[in-house]
Amino acid sequence: MRAGTLTASYLLDWILGDPESYPHPVRLIGWAVESGERPLRRMGEGRKAEFICGALLTSSVVLGSALVISKLIQSIKAHHRPLGTAAEVWLGASCLATRNLLDEANAVVKALETSHLESARLRLARIVGRDTAALNENEIARAVIETLAESLCDGIIAPLFYLTLGGVPLSIAYKATNTLDSMIGHKDERYEWFGKAAARLDDAANVLPSRISALLICGSAALMERGAFQRAWMTWRRDARKHASPNAGQTESSMAGALGVQLGGINTYNSEPVETPLLGAEFEGPNVSAVRKALRVTAVASVMGFALGCLVLNWRQND
């Protein structure tokens, strides 16, 4: 991918986002996962069989997605190069989620600012997996900030990283990995073994992007507040490993330090409380103004990640 193509994809995502009425590769990937799970589960029972079948589904969807997209772009370019480039731009934009992430989080903030707590809970439920029906204002604020931090990596920096590294096919492979993890990478009775390969692959795919994202959060904070870089850096390096996720802990701890707020605590999933470690334990809990600041940090980190990708692509092109 060239820097100009990446720029067009990034701007298209900023302008349009991902309207629900538009076709989207991730929806097709989700359909493939659902369609493949049923027959594969009939192939055997027990932990070993479930793991093998889940690994087969994971590898088939990830490699198949990348191959189909690669052949599609090549085929269109062979017949009409400008149209092929346009398809590459659109597919690249579909891998990114800056506009959607900021819009969804902003909708929750607006509901909080106008004291529509129930509306804020409903909007929040669109972007988090935890139970939202009984959350108070501060708990909603924390949930939004944690989602912004984690989704900065999953929805923006990681796709940019893979677009820069291997173009649209590799970024689509990443989105397939991420989709598989969200659909079957759960630690419950149904998916503990069937989804283990997907969960491990997603962890591996996010090792570098999550740490780049955490560093970009530090850099973004430095542009907004004096001393924020050091605070974000120290909190990140100290607290990242406390988190159960090897990757979410990177961005959430960095964001906690960048904002000077405490993240983590008790979350409820399917009516079951789950205690998560405190990140930035010395700070106060977040409020609505902290979420506004988190939105700015996320937006600036996104732009910084895009600029970094363009620099790398230009360097490779001129080398």
PLM regions: where:
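Solvent-exposed interhelical
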Residues: S182
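Hydrophobic alpha-helical transmembrane segments
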Residues: M1-I172, T177, G185-D319
